Design a protein with these regions (language model features):
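Class I S-adenosyl-L-methionine-dependent methyltransferase catalytic core
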Residues: 1-186
Length: 186
C-alpha cells in the first residue's frame, strides 16, 4: 500500500465514484488525469457497459478500474512490475470487482498468444518506451479487436500519434497539459 498521503488515483464515475486508491511510486508510472479520464469515458459511455476491456499498461489502474466501476463486463489488466500487480490486486479486491483479471506480463509478449477479441482497449504505455505503433500493429494483426472496437491512445503532447492500422479511424482526440489522447475506432 502507498504511504499515507502518497500516490492515489480517484475513481471518477460509476459504482465506485469518489473512491481513492493507492498506487506505487515507480519511475514512469503516470496515471491518466481526472480530466482526461472524464473526457474518455464520456466518449465511451454508450459502449462501456457490458464491454470486454483490455488495459495493456495498467500502472495505477486508473483506466481499467474506472471501466469496471462504470459497468464493463470483463476487464483484463496487464503490467510487468510485481509491485504494481500486487497493488492492482489489492485495489480490485478492496472494491470487490470480480470481473477484473490482473496479469503480470510484458504487454508485447502477451499479445503474441492466441487472441480473444476485446471491445475496448486502453493503450497508454510509458511515454519513454515509444511503444504505441508496435502495440497498435499487434492488436490489429493478431486479432485482438472486436469488429467495431474502440482503442484509446495516450502519448506525450510533443509527439504526434503514430500511423494507425489502415482500417482504424481516429474518432476523437484532444490535448490536456503534456498529454495527447485519442480514441480510434476499428
Amino acid at each position: 500500500m502507498a504511504k499515507r498521503g502518497g500516490n492515489q488515483v480517484r475513481i471518477i464515475g460509476g459504482e465506485h465514484r469518489g473512491r481513492k486508491l493507492p498506487f506505487p511510486d515507480l519511475p514512469g508510472l503516470r496515471p491518466s488525469g481526472d480530466r482526461v479520464r472524464e473526457t474518455l469515458f464520456n466518449w465511451l459511455q454508450p459502449v462501456i457497459i457490458n464491454a470486454r476491456c483490455l488495459d495493456l499498461f495498467a500502472g495505477s489502474g486508473a483506466l481499467g478500474l474506472e471501466a469496471a466501476s462504470r459497468g464493463a463486463r470483463e476487464v483484463v489488466m496487464l503490467d510487468q512490475a510485481a509491485q504494481v500487480v500486487r497493488q492492482l490486486e489489492a485495489n480490485r479486491d478492496l472494491l470487490g470487482l470480480t470481473q477484473v483479471q490482473i496479469i503480470k506480463a510484458d504487454a508485447l509478449r502477451w499479445l503474441e498468444q492466441y487472441p480473444r477479441p476485446f471491445d475496448v482497449v486502453f493503450v497508454d504505455p510509458p511515454f519513454a518506451a515509444n511503444l504505441l505503433s508496435e502495440v497498435c500493429a499487434k492488436l490489429e494483426d493478431r486479432g485482438w479487436l472486436a469488429s467495431d472496437a474502440f482503442i484509446y491512445l495516450e502519448e506525450d503532447a510533443d509527439r504526434d500519434f503514430p500511423d494507425l492500422p489502415e482500417n482504424w479511424r481516429l474518432y476523437r482526440q484532444q490535448q490536456a497539459g503534456q498529454v495527447r489522447f485519442g480514441l480510434a475506432r476499428r
